[in-house]
Amino acid sequence: MFVAPAFAQEADHTAGETHTETGVAEGGHEGGFPPFLVETYPSQLLWLAITFGLFYLFLKRVVLPRIAGILEVRSDRIAQDLDQAARMKEDADAAVAAYEQELAEARKKAAAIAQEARDTAKAEAAAERRKVESGLDSKLKEAEARIALIKDTALSDVGTIAEETAAAIVQELVGGKVDKASLSAAVKAVQQQ
């Protein structure tokens, strides 16, 4: 029976009868609190089993599949995020490697340009030095030629002056004239010593 006899109505009321007093029958207090009565245990256990079964079915068919779906979606999202993070890390590593390679190539190119500039500067400096040296050599040769010309002129003038002076000295000392050819030969002999 689904309803315990303690809950059943004990007295029938007629339709037109009014109650003047409300009260509890004397016999209703003997049993105690209905959930604690042994006579109501089978009914309580039956409803407990039905309620637990319905709750179990509700959890099994409705709540747990939703939770499992949510967990699966979250797991898939986490896996996708991890895959995306791995791809982004690979892309970042590739970008870093490309950057480092380009940087190394730029350094090599800069070193080559600097070396080329140094070599060009050295070559230009050497060419300029050779040009200056050749200019100085030609000026030195011209100067030496002028000096030799001036020296020869001076020496020829000295020779002439020496000849004239020797002629004057001989004329004063000896009182006679000396031959110009012998004076020239004597002066040249002295100059060559």
UniProtKB/Swiss-Prot annotation:
Region (Disordered): 9-28
InterPro entries assigned to the protein according to its UniProt record, in alphabetical order: ATP_synth_b/b'su_bac/chlpt, ATP_synthase_B_chain
GO cellular component: plasma membrane; proton-transporting ATP synthase complex
Bilayer disposition of the protein: Single-pass membrane protein
Self-association state and partner proteins as the record states: F-type ATPases have 2 components, F(1) - the catalytic core - and F(0) - the membrane proton channel. F(1) has five subunits: alpha(3), beta(3), gamma(1), delta(1), epsilon(1). F(0) has three main subunits: a(1), b(2) and c(10-14). The alpha and beta chains form an alternating ring which encloses part of the gamma chain. F(1) is attached to F(0) by a central stalk formed by the gamma and epsilon chains, while a peripheral stalk is formed by the delta and b chains.
Transmembrane segments: 40-59
Gene this chain is encoded by: atpF1
Ranges of Basic and acidic residues composition bias in the record: 10-20
Protein family (similarity comment): Belongs to the ATPase B chain family.
PANTHER family found in the cross-reference section: ATP SYNTHASE SUBUNIT B (PTHR33445:SF1), ATP SYNTHASE SUBUNIT B', CHLOROPLASTIC (PTHR33445)
Gene3D superfamilies documented for this protein: 6.10.250.1580
Function according to Swiss-Prot or TrEMBL: F(1)F(0) ATP synthase produces ATP from ADP in the presence of a proton or sodium gradient. F-type ATPases consist of two structural domains, F(1) containing the extramembraneous catalytic core and F(0) containing the membrane proton channel, linked together by a central stalk and a peripheral stalk. During catalysis, ATP synthesis in the catalytic domain of F(1) is coupled via a rotary mechanism of the central stalk subunits to proton translocation. Component of the F(0) channel, it forms part of the peripheral stalk, linking F(1) to F(0).
Taxon lineage: Bacteria, Pseudomonadati, Pseudomonadota, Alphaproteobacteria, Hyphomicrobiales
Protein name as it appears in the record: ATP synthase subunit b 1
NCBIfam families on file: PRK09174.1 (NF006612)
Organism: Chelativorans sp. (strain BNC1)
Source species, domain of life: Bacteria
Single GO MF descriptor: proton-transporting ATPase activity, rotational mechanism
Keywords: ATP synthesis, Cell inner membrane, Cell membrane, CF(0), Hydrogen ion transport, Ion transport, Membrane, Transmembrane, Transmembrane helix, Transport
